Amino acid sequence: MISEINGANLAYLGDAVLELLVRKKLVLSGGKLGDINKIADAYVRAGAQSKAADKLASVLTDEETAVYKRGKNVHHNSIPKNATEKEYKKATGLEALFGYLYLKGDTERIEELLDIAFPGNDTP
């Protein structure tokens, strides 16, 4: 069933998963809400997600790479002004991967990939 979900829908879900996990990470690290919100926005921008996808490329399984590519190849009618088309496609692939892993219930792998993509308290 999960393997039949298209890349756009996986990315839609993965966007929410990434947003929640980034917020969780930042809240647990402490800080003022206004600061946390600005940092969270930086993490979930297409440019930061594109860089995160590059960091993860060498550690993805074949299955994960296939899901990432399925998301990356989704057709977009518009690209945000703050990202290039290439960045946006990579970000969509990353979101699709996180959506897929969430549906599989593989929270351990999600956390592992998040730690590699966004190590420590580094901001993108």
Q: Where are the model-predicted features located?
A:
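Double-stranded RNA-binding/processing signature
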Residues: 1-124
